């Protein structure tokens, strides 16, 4: 079990980014499994948007990390963090990480995982702790429905309600970039 919020966050993000790139067959924890499931649902629902983000990585981890910081600042400026916005930020960063990996930048995904973990644990750590940390994430995304079909539908609605403004902010930032 990780010793700190930053360490736990880094491990979860590294697992998700590896999974997103086709590796990491089994999730190392229930939290990692929930993150994968919720992220896959958001990415499926907003596939065209996230696909349009991939070219923004530009095969350079520093540029991708700078873009991540801009997007995080924009989300914060547009009303702060919530679980949906956090998830949208993770999926957005996972898209950049996968694009870097596909372009041959092996250190890109781990650098982005470290940058996002630092942002979430250091700049948003108080918010995360107030909302139950990653256990709170699992409670938020895992509480919807008991049947798989019902759960997926309700999960989709919950994600989109919580992430809607975050995705709009991401899209705005990317258009004006």
UniProtKB/Swiss-Prot annotation:
SMART domains: BCL
Membrane topology: Multi-pass membrane protein
Binding partners and assembly: Interacts with BAX.
One GO CC term on file: plasma membrane
Keywords recorded for this protein, A-Z: Apoptosis, Cell membrane, Membrane, Transmembrane, Transmembrane helix
Species of the source: Gallus gallus
Protein's UniProt name: Anti-apoptotic protein NR13
Superkingdom as given in the UniProt entry: Eukaryota
């Amino acid at each position: 079990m990780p010793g700190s919020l930053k360490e736990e966050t880094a491990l979860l993000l590294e697992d998700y980014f590896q999974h997103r790139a086709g590796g990491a067959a089994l999730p190392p924890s229930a939290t990692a499994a929930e993150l994968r499931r919720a992220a896959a649902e958001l990415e499926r629902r907003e596939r065209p948007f996230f696909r349009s983000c991939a070219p923004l990585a530009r095969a350079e981890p520093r540029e991708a990390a700078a873009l991540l910081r801009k997007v995080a600042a924009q989300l914060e400026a547009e009303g702060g963090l919530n679980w949906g916005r956090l998830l949208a930020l993770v999926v957005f960063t996972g898209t950049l990480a996968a694009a870097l990996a596909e372009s041959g930048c092996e250190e890109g995904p781990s650098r982005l995982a470290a940058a996002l973990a630092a942002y979430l644990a250091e700049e948003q750590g108080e918010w995360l702790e107030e909302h139950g940390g990653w256990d709170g994430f699992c409670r938020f995304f895992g509480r919807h429905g008991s049947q798989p079909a019902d759960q997926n539908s309700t999960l989709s609605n919950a994600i989109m309600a919580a992430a809607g403004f975050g995705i709009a902010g991401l899209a705005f930032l990317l258009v004006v970039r």
